[in-house]
Amino acid sequence: MKLRKLLLSVLMVAASLAANAQLNSSNATTNYAKFKKFFNDDICTELALPYSAMTDEQLREQMSDIAKELVDVAIKIKNDAWEKNEKEFRIAKFKPHTNPMIWEDYMNVYTYSLMPVPTGITGNYEYVMIFVGDDVPEEVSLSVCKVVGNDGHGFSYNSIKKGLNVVQMPGDEEARMLFLEYYVNTDTTATSKKLADYPEITLHIEGGHVNGYFDITKHDDAYWRELLATHKADSVLSSYKGIQVMGEKVMFHMSRDKIAAVCPNTITDAIGWWDELVKFEHKLMGADKYYDRWNDLIMARNGEGSYMYATQGYTYYENSTLAEILPWEAVYSSPGRIWGPAHEIGHVNQGTINIVSCTEASNNLFSNAMIHNVGKTTTRGVGVATCRDDYSKKIAFPLRGDVIGKSRMFFQLYLYFHAAEKDTTFYPRLFEALRHDRLNKGYQDSNWAYHTSATEDQLKFAEKCCEIAQMDLSEFFEAWGFFETMDETVVGDYGTYIVSLSKEEAEASRARMQRYEKKAGHLMFIEDRIKPSPRTDGVAGNRIDFNDEYAIGKMGSFGQWGDYIDESVKAQGYYYARSLNTITIKEATGAKGALGFKLYNAQTGELLDFNNGYKLTVPVAHANAPLKVVAAQADGTDYTVPSVADSDDEEMQLESLNATLATVKNLTSKTTTTGKEIGHFYKSALTEINALYKEAKAAADNKDTSKHSYKEWIALLEQEMEALKSNPSARAYLKELDVYTLTNGQLRSYGMCYDKYGLIANTTQQMANTLPNKRWMFESTGVAHHYYIKNKNGLYINDMADNGTSCSGEDQLTAWVFKANYLDDGTVYFTTQDGLYLAMDVNSYNIVAGKELVSAATWGIRAVELNNTAIEEVEFEAENEEVKSEIYDLTGRKVENPTKGMYIVNGKKVFIK
């Protein structure tokens, strides 16, 4: 059978070439000059008199010196002997199109379809005759290309011009479709020509075979069924296996059998919803304003393998997905199926907003926005909790690992400005602004890695958002890690990017954002999955969950996008209670208006935590700092949340008292009699607070307010705790010359150790605490609680990075300076000298690293060799404010003007002469 088919193919090809021997590109001009004399028009579609009244034999005799192929065309026209639907594709008008290779730069998009429109004519080893009736202007490009099946690119291009153009179709076992490229010269300037300034061009095409195509502007589903039924797939010379479905903005360039299997009866719904998807993306990116001069198409093609992707000229979808992404009924039954096409087309359109690391994230703006726009379900992606967790770890935005999570940053802007209708021109204007002032990925080195300044990438995006919105969005971008510093940080994103951002650059950018008067400190909380919201797809009821993972009820308790609309609603009825390092939000009767809660260091203004739930966590480094809790409100301002102690509700006051008692209990539970347990309080210093605790505890247990109200007990306890913590002689502090071991506060069997690779944490089974590399000494810098740290072998800690810490220097001049900070639970944590970063925390590899905020960052410190027993003598300098501010007598009272005698200076007993 195969041999017979091959033989038939060879014979037919030979016959075809022989038949075409009279007409080719070399003699086309001569033949055309003779042929068009018989017609009323230049494209030879209307025979003139008397030729139209002649018999076939008479006409052939008149045309005896013209190529037979042309004579056969004339006879067909005279007799109106067109096959069904043939004339529609043989004689057709074509609209001008813009060149995707030019407009990809104008619009900062990936290349749209490189094949604007099919002619519906196929061929295989045949000559095709193309009549062009008009002159082609210099600024216009007119050509044809041949495409095998549903290949994404054409090949063998031929320019065509006025007159007769003879084009040979290449071939093998499969025919080619002839595509037309009628490219006109338009641009984005105000003076540009419009598409309407260029005429439609009419072509008359003969030769080859009529395969046809579907056009939503011309055809209906009845025609679609007819097109599928009459397709001549069994003919060798017309064995074209593809089919095209033309929408207004999309072209399905598919395998005929695959699309017929999933859309056997109707195609208008499929191409219709894809058109709406592309129009929606265009509107969001502000591209629809150019529709009068830009009409490139998105191509969708199918194939075997490689699930879905976007590349130059087309988007691709695996055969098995077609049944789910083409018929609207199938898509609407599970709107998550919108995600794939919107995601891939989003790849084509994302360039303008594509921050480093976001190639698989920024395009999901279109996916989530389209799903929200359809109005049946909620959207996809992790919630505020993931952003919050990343913020607590100080992870820079490009390094945040959850791609769908990063997508929510873009979508939160959509929810606020578009869904909540704060400014529905926000994204179109943002895209337009960034098309003119583009994100800059930097230069590419010899290893193809890009060296990117975050100021020209993510921070340019953020600042442009503020500019377009005329709002201060700095806190939103802070929550997303935009201001975290990066020192040539390697980021993978379909290539290598080496990203840098200094603290000075970050703060300068933040300052520029904060110029805008209107604040948006609530934007980080906005969600569409906090509580049910009405459907907008014409069906009664509320939106259903996108899936169980992102279900309503799992994504937090505050921040539903609808609650942002009415800015007159103010927060009220909220209180907070603190227990150790956990802050819990409490609601009085009638509490309302909060969109989320934020925790600040009241002294520095630093944002410490935020949540769209009821819990906030005090970071280790701020455990002893003054705190401020606020509720974000719909107008972007914050409402200061009072403590439950300030509530008029007695039950809340009692709850606050119990929380305060728990704090006192924790504070006084770690004690020392010898001073070896660093950070612990001396038992002798706890007499007064223990007595007060006992009395207040009895009052709370018995609900007795006869002596003091609950508020008064709280105030007394807090006052006593503050007095205890400020008494320098009440707690055991680090001393020079003494030798210590450090045990991790979370990984309690792990001690800090130096090996040849740097600092690690290991167990006593791995290395005994008696070894010098596991014993540490602290040399004072002269500033209270600031130290150089070295092991007993004399090696200083002299370098610290995110992935490890070095302990290799023998010279104090190269050593790092660390500040020791004492926590209420008796542990100590270290920060860098400037206090900005937590240092010496144990990561998941048991490496002691720096500049991360993780839970294994506290240390229990114990003196194992006491060498500092002498009383020091110092010469007091009145002008030394650093010393003067740290002088106490032996009872713990601060001394402003000391005389000769023994005092506590910077935590040490000294004798002032």
Model regions and ranges:
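Beta-rich interaction/scaffold domains
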Residues: 649-738, 789
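Beta-strand-enriched, solvent-exposed domains that form extended recognition/catalytic surfaces
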Residues: 23-215, 570-648
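Zn2+-dependent metallopeptidase catalytic core
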Residues: 135, 150-164, 168-299
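Lectin-like carbohydrate-binding module/patch detector with strong preference for beta-trefoil
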Residues: 730-868
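Catalytic cores of extracellular degradative/oxidative enzymes
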Residues: 230-441, 461, 465
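C-terminal tail/sorting-segment detector
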Residues: 902-913
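Pan-zinc metallopeptidase signature
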Residues: 23-83, 419-569
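Residue-level detector of functionally pivotal "anchor" positions at catalytic/ligand-binding pockets or at interdomain
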Residues: 865-891
